Amino acid sequence: MDLSSKPQQQLLNSLPIAGELTVTGEMGVCYKECLKNHAANLGGHALDGCGEFMPSPTATSTDPSSLRCAACGCHRNFHRRDPSENLNFLTAPPISSPSGTESPPSRHVSSPVPCSYYTSAPPHHVILSLSSGFPGPSDQDPTVVRSENSSRGAMRKRTRTKFTPEQKIKMRAFAEKAGWKINGCDEKSVREFCNEVGIERGVLKVWMHNNKYSLLNGKIREIEHGLCLNTHSNDGDGSSSS
């Protein structure tokens, strides 16, 4: 009694035979993602996102022009040719023998799908490298960035203390009396002077350091000018007496 059925026989006939030339490509050759540049006329680079060549149902191996991808519509030549990956062929399901004993399982095991199959395919969307027109970080005006940085630096900069003319006169008199050195002065007198003028000790110390040489040079020039005037007046008195 023949236990084989027609559906099982039809399934066996429809399976591809290992080593047979398929529509996908040559034996042991796979065609991966589509590399056709759809933005070549615009001077850019755009892919359609097709990750693997899918043969069209109407394609025949005798007509090369019919070898178009059913997913993206591009010819097989636009897809990346990968000869390193072999085609995986389906194995027929085990058929019960007439004696009722199960046949041993087939030793043919399909090779696992390589990891490069999942990582090599680009995302399924159009990738455009053309400029979108929106300002990015590199499109910002450098003057605006510099002005922002300068404004932050100005905020961090210490504000200068402004003194009234009366405060300047009193601080100059105190500095001349102390010899332009605050460290050698009596701390009690320094605190009393700072409370009287309305400044802090550190402010007085900085002011004395910044104005020591300028005011001393000005005072020296005043003394020299006075000596010159006295010399001229003495010369005039001597000439008139003679």
From Swiss-Prot:
* Induction behaviour: Up-regulated by abscisic acid and by drought and salt stress. Not induced by cold.
Tissue-wise expression:
Expressed in roots, inflorescences, open flowers and seeds. Detected in stems and seedlings.
What are the boundaries of the ZF-HD dimerization-type zinc fingers?
Answer: 31-82
Question: Is the keyword Glycoprotein in the record?
Answer: no
What compartments host this protein? Nucleus
Gene3D superfamilies, per the entry? Homeodomain-like
- Among its keywords, does the record have Transcription regulation? yes
Q: Which residue positions hold the site described Required for DNA-binding?
A: M208
Per UniProt, the keywords (alphabetical) are: DNA-binding, Homeobox, Metal-binding, Nucleus, Transcription, Transcription regulation, Zinc, Zinc-finger
Instruction: Report the GO molecular function annotations.
Output: DNA binding; DNA-binding transcription factor activity; protein homodimerization activity; transcription cis-regulatory region binding; zinc ion binding
Q: What happens when the gene is disrupted?
A: No visible phenotype. Increased sensitivity to salt stress.
Task: Name any GO cellular component annotation.
Answer: nucleus
Biological-process GO terms, alphabetical: positive regulation of DNA-templated transcription; response to water deprivation
Which Pfam families does the record associate with it?
A: ZF-HD_dimer
Q: Which domain of life is it from?
A: Eukaryota
**Region annotated Disordered, chain positions:** 83-109, 135-161
Q: What is its main location?
A: nucleus
UniProt cross-references to PANTHER family, sorted A to Z: ZINC-FINGER HOMEODOMAIN PROTEIN 11 (PTHR31948:SF145), ZINC-FINGER HOMEODOMAIN PROTEIN 2 (PTHR31948)
Instruction: Indicate the quaternary assembly.
Output: Homo- and heterodimer with other ZFHD proteins. Interacts with HIPP20, HIPP21, HIPP22, HIPP23, HIPP24, HIPP26, HIPP27, HIPP30 and MED25 (via ACID domain). Interacts with NAC019, NAC055 and NAC072 (via NAC binding domain). Binds to ZHD1, ZHD2, ZHD3, ZHD4, ZHD5, ZHD6, ZHD7, ZHD8, ZHD9, ZHD12, ZHD13 and ZHD14.
Anything noted about its domains?
Answer: The C-terminus contains the DNA-binding domain (156-218) while the N-terminus contains the transcriptional activation domain (8-82). The homeodomain differs form the typical one by having namely 4 instead of 3 extra amino acids inserted in the loop between helix 1 and helix 2.
The task this protein performs is described as: Transcription factor involved in the up-regulation of several stress-inducible genes. Acts as a transcriptional activator by interacting with MED25 and NAC proteins. Involved in increased drought tolerance.
Which NCBIfam families does its entry note? homeo_ZF_HD, ZF_HD_prot_N
Name of the protein:
Zinc-finger homeodomain protein 11
Organism the protein comes from: Arabidopsis thaliana (Mouse-ear cress)
The primary gene name is: ZHD11
